[in-house]
Amino acid sequence: MEHVTEGSWESLPVPLHPKVLSVLRELGFPYMTPVQSATIPLFMKNKDVAAEAVTGSGKTLAFVIPIEEILLRREEKFKKSQVGAIIITPTRELAVQIEEVLSHFTKPFPQFSQILWIGGRNPGEDVARFKELGGNIIVATPGRLEDMFRRKAEGLDLASCVRSLEVLVLDEADRLLDMGFETSINTILEFLPKQRRTGLFSATQTQEVENLVRAGLRNPVRISVKEKGVAASSTQKTPSRLENHYMVCKADEKFNQLVHFLRNHKQEKHLVFFSTCACVEYYGKALETLVKGVKIMCIHGKMKYKRNKIFMEFRKLQSGILVCTDVMARGIDIPEVNWVLQYDPPSNASAFVHRCGRTARIGHGGSALVFLLPMEESYISFLAINQKCPLQEMKLQKNTADLLPKLKAMALGDRAVFEKGMKAFVSYVQAYAKHECNLIFRLKDLDFASLARGFALLRMPKMPELRGKQFPDFVPVDVNTDTIPFKDKIREKQRQKQLLEQQRKEKTENDGRRKFIKNKAWSKQKAKKEKKKKLTEKRKREEGSDVEDEDMEELLNDTRLLKKFKKGKITEEEFEKGLLTSGKRSTNKADLEISDLEDDC
């Protein structure tokens, strides 16, 4: 394990290019952070590095600067289509951020070109841009980069372009694996030359990360950077200048407490984390209405094309609120975030650390607050032990305004709000059921009535988790929710059209059902007629056909004899004798009838 020091950039054992030093001064970074002073010299001496450091410790510059220096020291100049470095990162937002930082360092060196490959963009346009402008340094998300390696239709042969690769960086490696990119990473590694320098950067060390180190790095130097002033025996994973708080309140008090807090901190910059995309959509809309005089924006993983624009816009704000999911929890560097508010605790403990790390970055101060239900209070000690992350209690604010009736009124006035509330509640319950810390976050202990009031629901939704449960403490509104219209006239017109189509469909089905019932009655009438016809024929036979009657009698006698024989009541000899007697009787009768007929003639 390397000894970690820090100092000025000029104190590095391998000198940096004067233009690189100039950019560092312009950006306001006169000194290195511990992870930078530990990593940069090793990277520049052709070592593979696996660096673990707390979030917000300056890991981005720890690989951007070595990339720049390594490419500058290459004797042969790069052609525009030759790739010298690849940086892989788990999310679009982080990729955009890294590409922005990188652009400061490539600007003084026009011989280098860089390109950003992320989802949410047209891949054909990415290929065209690469062929036109080149990309000596690629910043990409795993899925898009894998797609580019496999893409042949547009005439791109990326496998040939990466033969000149000098450096590969895997940023937020633990998150890359958590998000299911392991297969994509392994596919990408197969295309890359073995003779390269590889850097793996992570805030947490897991077994999966260790496996990736063994697969992708050659004799790596392992670097673990602790917070200054933290005891060696400790493994604190949050910045030392971060103040961590918690507030215990009931589910139907949380929203009022959140709004009260935001109204009292309008001049500051906040990230508000929710557990699901649906919760972001619902509460983001509610906060826009109830917290006036402050810019409120929403971002989550299901946004395909708006995310980058929203992210870049929020970064530029001096104050504002970004309502988000964990898509914003890792590696994202948003300038001067004052508070990280966790309305819902994250699904795992490591995500808690990463959420908090969006503030108090690179030596700046910052604060974080997590809202907990009374049944979740043991999570505080769990974080202190598991993540070495102590929390201080923040008392409930008294005399807060009750905003839930206003939220209900919003739902009654606009079907969009009503539907978003229902979806948010369902998604929250489903996410809660899958919580990693299920000994603390137990679904069976959840107060669903209080939770539904906290979501300002008009009625309880139908879902498997609530089947068979009674909620005497929850009073649904005395309104037929099917009649609630959309405020958007176009959406309401579409809804009414769908309702009419549904009514026509139901009418058609009902008519078909009635027709089936009528057909069934007709069948009964037909059967009745058949029965009547048979009775008539029988009567006619009895009246006009003595021969047929005798034949029937003979058949019945033969049947009776056969039954007696099978049951053992008569012998075989008696059975045959009976048959002969029956036949003679019929013959005599027939002969008599024929003679009578001849006499009549």
Curated annotation (Swiss-Prot):
Disulfide bonds: none annotated. GO terms for molecular function: ATP binding; ATP hydrolysis activity; RNA binding; RNA helicase activity. GO terms for cellular component: nucleolus. Residues 40-223 form the Helicase ATP-binding domain. Residues 502-514 have a biased composition (Basic and acidic residues). The modification Phosphoserine is found at residues 545, 595. The Q motif is unique to and characteristic of the DEAD box family of RNA helicases and controls ATP binding and hydrolysis. This is ATP-dependent RNA helicase DDX55. It comes from Bos taurus. The lineage of its organism: Eukaryota, Metazoa, Chordata, Craniata, Vertebrata. The gene is DDX55.
